[in-house]
Amino acid sequence: MNPGEPADPAPVPLPEPKRLGTLARLAPEPMKVVLNWGRRYSLWVFNFGLACCAIEFIAASMARHDFIRLGVIPFAPGPRQADLMVVSGTVTDKMAPAVKRLYEQMPEPKYVISFGACSNCGGPYWDSYSVTKGVDQIIPVDVYVPGCPPRPEALLQGILKLQEKIARESLGERYGVSPRPSTAALQSGLVRPPEPEPEPEPEPEPEPGQGPGQGPGSGEGTDTGSDAGRGR
């Protein structure tokens, strides 16, 4: 740049645009409270039972504990109809892709409770080569319930903690740019499956009139013109 030429202007920093839904931008504060109240007491739960902690989840859903009185509806038909996933039991590297796939099929807003020591950090099998060291390596988790296995009362306490979190949520944070990491950004630490061996290519079939090993480039069975020169 010559001394007489003006310097280039410095770039102006612009704030990163945030995409908020129409409901998040236009709903007044009383309406946000009503929407949070509705989501808080209408959690349709999908139980991903992998080990003995799933039995405690079933016990919590029976008449003695009856978590339906807390607004939790058990046994959703599938992940596409569920609001809450409860991962109970040991998550292995082989099962981890299925857990992640079912989580991605759940509609927003969706929540996850890690139920039991095995789901939290691997539990007594943490040093096994095939055990995922916590389901939070695959999907984001909202509430951790410790225990091996936890009692049904511990799950009820975890549900109450999740409902308190939902009541404090902002629709702008939930439906806009969420601070929760995406499932693609999380490190899974899974064991890569072996790649299939390539299939051998089939050998070309010989043309009619050619024997095995005779081809257009083999030099056999072709007239090069040298025999005609010898007969002269």
From Swiss-Prot:
Residues 196-206 have a biased composition (Acidic residues). It comes from the Bacteria. Residues 210-222 have a biased composition (Gly residues). It is found in: Cell membrane. One of its GO terms (molecular function) is 4 iron, 4 sulfur cluster binding. Residues 173-232 are annotated as: Disordered. Transmembrane segments: none annotated. One of its GO terms (biological process) is aerobic respiration. InterPro entries: NADH_UbQ_OxRdtase-like_20kDa, NADH_UQ_OxRdtase_20Kd_su. The keyword Lyase does not apply. SUPFAM superfamilies: HydA/Nqo6-like. It is a peripheral membrane protein. One of its GO terms (cellular component) is respiratory chain complex I. It catalyses: a quinone + NADH + 5 H(+)(in) = a quinol + NAD(+) + 4 H(+)(out). It holds the Pfam family Oxidored_q6. [4Fe-4S] cluster binds at residues 52-53, 118, 148. It is an enzyme of class 7 (translocase). Binds 1 [4Fe-4S] cluster. Its cofactor is [4Fe-4S] cluster. Belongs to the complex I 20 kDa subunit family. NDH-1 is composed of 14 different subunits. Subunits NuoB, C, D, E, F, and G constitute the peripheral sector of the complex. NCBIfam families: nuoB_fam (TIGR01957), PRK06411.1 (NF005012). NDH-1 shuttles electrons from NADH, via FMN and iron-sulfur (Fe-S) centers, to quinones in the respiratory chain. The immediate electron acceptor for the enzyme in this species is believed to be a menaquinone. Couples the redox reaction to proton translocation (for every two electrons transferred, four hydrogen ions are translocated across the cytoplasmic membrane), and thus conserves the redox energy in a proton gradient. This is NADH-quinone oxidoreductase subunit B 2. It comes from Streptomyces coelicolor (strain ATCC BAA-471 / A3(2) / M145). The gene is nuoB2.
